[in-house]
Structures are given as structure tokens and as C-alpha cells.
């Protein structure tokens, strides 16, 4: 059985490198010691005339996954290597750059570097609450959290307020749910739907809605069907028992009572919350929730940076310099996702927060 690292070990042993003219290594601050050995072997065996290594030690946030940050930093201090710093950011505005610079300069061992922000001033705010209702009414938002548990808390709040959002880059609503709701709504209006839509619809109803042996739609995908046809020929029950005291005609039942398939049933309160808030189920989400680590490489006009910490990161950030440096890098990455506005949120749930960011914010010119 092969582990991931075994591929590197065997590749290094065989020294069967492809012939290259140039060797490019990106995100080099995240490479592990074993991966650096692969780079060394490629440099020796590939015949590459030049090796270009790109990375930013201030964004080295994967030490916990094995990243050898010190190796990357030591390469910049090797006089045999030529350093070409990138001196212009095309993302962050002045106000975000000022804070990000303060955070980066608090890291004890780093490659000294300077870069300019965009000309736009931007905005930087510190808030004592998570403005997850009215504060998100306009614009694109990236809400960044230190841990998966905090992502979960924020997600629950967004669903209560009826916001359509993405989590870790993916919509939290299955498109098939939306297709089923549309299909049932059209049937109730007296319209026809395709066999493909019937298939989706039947998938989201159980035997209390569809007669036994009709659980899978057996019509033709290219044909059209109305509600009466589904009742007469395809097993849709005409009367539905909704509770011990209530039975209703299938023609009078709203989608949120009719569609009771296991996956959809759990999401109905959230789907109804979206609609009550005046939002459309099929709209493109303006809001995304993510951990800081998962957001690396991303950007958004507006970033809400939640500073709550779990005990583990908090303990590491207060016990030793390496822990302080690593946590500073994490929040540096979080802050620099913002293209226009950065909203820094004080601890609201747990016991701990990343306190240095507020010290740096107060000391920004």
C-alpha cells in the first residue's frame, strides 16, 4: 500500500527526472522537507538551466501539514541565489496594506520585503458583533474563520437570516433541490413538466406521496406530463396525509409540505428562510464562508475576518515565538484577501481570540 509520501521517496530513489530547460516551483513556502528533496533531485538530474522558485514566507500557514518554512527562508539568505521581490500588490488597498504590514513585521524570522498597495484607500473596520444580517445586504463577501467549528457557527447564523451562501467554494444548496421545487410549483399552476423533471421530483418524495412500486418515475424523459397524468398513470397519490388530523388534496399542497425526501426535508427550513428574506434560490451566492487556510489564493471585495480562536491555536500563539509567528501568518493571509473593505470582528462566541491584530490595528498610522 502506497502512502502519498512514498511517491516522492521512490521518485527520488529512481532519479528518473524528465529533461527540462527551466524548472518552476510555485507556492514554495508550503513545500515539505521531502518535497524539497524532490526539487533538489530535479535540479541535479533534469538539466534545467534555471530554477525559478516563487513563494511568500509571510503566507506560510501549513507548518502543521509539514511545510518546511525555515528551508524556504534560508534560500533567500543564500548569496548564490538571486532574489526578485514583487513590489506591487494588485489586490489590497492602502488601509488593508497598513495593517497587513504591521502583522507581517511582528513575525520574528522572515524575509524582509516591501511592496506597495493599490492607489485606492479602502476601508478597515473593527466591530464587536458579527453583522451577519443587515451588514451583508450588499456586495460580495468572504467570511473567514480560524477553524471549521467557527465556520459551522457562522453557517447556522446565515441560514437563520436567509442568506444564500457558499461554504468552502461550493453552494450549500443542491441544484436538484431547486429543480424539484420548480417542477412542483409548475404542476400546481396547471403547467406541464418534462419527464426529466418528473424524475427529479420523484427522487425527492417518499411512499407517503407516491404509491408503492412507483418510487422511480417510469415515464419518458422527452415527454411532457401534468399533475392529473401523474396521479392517474404514474402513482402520485391524490390525497396526502400531512398529519394525524390533516389530509389534503395533492393539488393544494405547497412544495415545502409535498417534497419530503430525506435530503431535502432537512433543508426546507433554510430554503423557506431564503424565500421569506426576498432572496432567490437560484441566485449566484454573494457570500462565502471559509477557514483562512482554505481561502488561501482567494480574494473578495469585502472580507469579514472573525478573530475567534479555539484553545489549541490560542495556546500555541501564547506559549512560544514559533506559535506566535505561525498565528500571525494565518491572520496576515486572512487580512490580505480583502480588495476593498476589511471588517475585523472581536470574539463573540468562545473564550479566545487573536488579540495581537487589535494591537496592530490601533497602531496603524
Predicted segment positions?
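Conserved helicase/translocase P-loop NTPase motor core
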Residues: 1-24, 30-41, 267-291
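Conserved interdomain hinge at the start of the Helicase C-terminal
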Residues: 126-139
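Core RecA-like ATPase module of SF1/SF2 helicases and allied nucleic-acid translocases
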Residues: 94, 145-330, 335-342
Amino acid at each position: 500500500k502506497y502512502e502519498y509520501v512514498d511517491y516522492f521517496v521512490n521518485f527520488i530513489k529512481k532519479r528518473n527526472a524528465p529533461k527540462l530547460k527551466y524548472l518552476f516551483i510555485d507556492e514554495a513556502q508550503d513545500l515539505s522537507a521531502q518535497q524539497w528533496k524532490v526539487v533538489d533531485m530535479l535540479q541535479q538530474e533534469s538539466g534545467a538551466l534555471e530554477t525559478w522558485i516563487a513563494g511568500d514566507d509571510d503566507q506560510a500557514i501549513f507548518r502543521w501539514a509539514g511545510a518546511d518554512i525555515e528551508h524556504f527562508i534560508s534560500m533567500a539568505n543564500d548569496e548564490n541565489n538571486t532574489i526578485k521581490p514583487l513590489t506591487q500588490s494588485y489586490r489590497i488597498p492602502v488601509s488593508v496594506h497598513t495593517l497587513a504590514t504591521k502583522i507581517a513585521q511582528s513575525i520574528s524570522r522572515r524575509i524582509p520585503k516591501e511592496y506597495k498597495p493599490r492607489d485606492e484607500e479602502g476601508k478597515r473596520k473593527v466591530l464587536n458583533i458579527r453583522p451577519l444580517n443587515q451588514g451583508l445586504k450588499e456586495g460580495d463577501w468572504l467570511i473567514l474563520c480560524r477553524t471549521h467549528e467557527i465556520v459551522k457557527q457562522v453557517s447556522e447564523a446565515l441560514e437563520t437570516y436567509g442568506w444564500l451562501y457558499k461554504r468552502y467554494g461550493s453552494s450549500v444548496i443542491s441544484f436538484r433541490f431547486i429543480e424539484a421545487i420548480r417542477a412542483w410549483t409548475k404542476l400546481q399552476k396547471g403547467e406541464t413538466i418534462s419527464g426529466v423533471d418528473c424524475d427529479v421530483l420523484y427522487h425527492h418524495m417518499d411512499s407517503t406521496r407516491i404509491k408503492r412500486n412507483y418510487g422511480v418515475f417510469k415515464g419518458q424523459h422527452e415527454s411532457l406530463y401534468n399533475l392529473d397524468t401523474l396521479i392517474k398513470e404514474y402513482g402520485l397519490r391524490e390525497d396526502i396525509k400531512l398529519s394525524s388530523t390533516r389530509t389534503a388534496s395533492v393539488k393544494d399542497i405547497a412544495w415545502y409540505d409535498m417534497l419530503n425526501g430525506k435530503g431535502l426535508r432537512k433543508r426546507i427550513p433554510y430554503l423557506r428562510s431564503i424565500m421569506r428574506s426576498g432572496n432567490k434560490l437560484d441566485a449566484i451566492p454573494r457570500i462565502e464562508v471559509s477557514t483562512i487556510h482554505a481561502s488561501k489564493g482567494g480574494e473578495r471585495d469585502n472580507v469579514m475576518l472573525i478573530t475567534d480562536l479555539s484553545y489549541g491555536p490560542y495556546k500555541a500563539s501564547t506559549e512560544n515565538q514559533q506559535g506566535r509567528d505561525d498565528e500571525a501568518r494565518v491572520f496576515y493571509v486572512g487580512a490580505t484577501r480583502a480588495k476593498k473593505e476589511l471588517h475585523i470582528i472581536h470574539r463573540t462566541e468562545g473564550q479566545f481570540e487573536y488579540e495581537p491584530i487589535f494591537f496592530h490595528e490601533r497602531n496603524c498610522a
